Amino acid sequence: MSKRNTPQRRHNILALLSEQGEVSVDALAKRFATSEVTIRKDLAALETNGLLLRRYGGAVPVP
């Protein structure tokens, strides 16, 4: 996905998190065919906005 698709990817990450309860960086990178670094940046941005909590290797929903 290109930079213009970043908001859509982040939206999809939140949808997956809602469905699964937990997501891993590795699985997200494979699913979206992007690097783990990109996924970590996405998770960091979403955490900054209070939308999830990052954990080692992934993320969980905000309680």
Region spans (language model):
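HTH-adjacent hinge/linker in prokaryotic transcriptional regulators
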Residues: 2-37, 41-63
